[in-house]
Amino acid sequence: MKTAIYPGSFNPFHNGHLNILKKAILLFDKVYVVVSKNINKSLDPDLQSRVKNIKNLIRDFNNVEIIINENKLTTTIAKELNASFIIRGLRSQTDFEYEIKYYDGFKSLYPNIEVIYFISDYDKRSLSSTILREIEFYKK
């Protein structure tokens, strides 16, 4: 069985993330969406709220499971779930340069893992959780 994890803070999980997930489920038997804390980003809303949001968006997906990662490395989660693949999304060349560092880190910690990159569809590339949080903040 081909198993992958799709890790992220998903704060919030938006249509760009959903676009990548829809592509991933076509290739993998099982995809775990791993909702994690990000020490470099705000933790509001809490992990449970983020999971609830994602569940509402993926309720019709049969081969997707959501798990919370409170304090483990992505590669540790992959090993625990017997996942051989990590899913990542790319929107731009800047993302690619950023992701090379993650790739190197993943491979140094778990040499057998493969990182699979999906390019966001054109109409989803401008979406950013950081921008969406900022818009929501200033709407108040």
UniProtKB/Swiss-Prot annotation:
Catalysed transformations (reactions): (R)-4'-phosphopantetheine + ATP + H(+) = 3'-dephospho-CoA + diphosphate
Q: What is its pathway?
A: Cofactor biosynthesis; coenzyme A biosynthesis; CoA from (R)-pantothenate: step 4/5
Show the GO MF annotations.
ATP binding; pantetheine-phosphate adenylyltransferase activity
Name the Gene Ontology biological process terms: coenzyme A biosynthetic process
Q: Which InterPro entries match?
A: Cyt_trans-like, PPAT, Rossmann-like_a/b/a_fold
One GO CC term, this protein: cytoplasm
Where does the chain bind substrate? 9, 41, 74, 88
- Site keyed Transition state stabilizer: positions: 17
Per UniProt, the keywords (alphabetical) are: ATP-binding, Coenzyme A biosynthesis, Cytoplasm, Magnesium, Nucleotide-binding, Nucleotidyltransferase, Transferase
The answer to whether keyword Transmembrane applies is no
Which cofactor names does the annotation list? Mg(2+)
Top-level taxon of origin: Bacteria
Q: Where does ATP bind?
A: 9-10, 17, 89-91, 99, 124-130
* Enzyme Commission designation: 2.7.7.3
Q: What class of enzyme is it?
A: transferase
Q: Where in the cell is it found?
A: Cytoplasm
What NCBIfam families would the database entry show? coaD_prev_kdtB, cyt_tran_rel
Q: Per its database record, what is this protein's job?
A: Reversibly transfers an adenylyl group from ATP to 4'-phosphopantetheine, yielding dephospho-CoA (dPCoA) and pyrophosphate.
Per its UniProt record, what HAMAP family does this chain match? PPAT_bact
**What family does this belong to?**
Belongs to the bacterial CoaD family.
What assembly does the database describe for this protein? Answer: Homohexamer.
This chain's protein is named Phosphopantetheine adenylyltransferase
Q: What is the lineage of its organism?
A: Bacteria, Bacillati, Mycoplasmatota, Mollicutes, Mycoplasmataceae
Corresponding gene? coaD
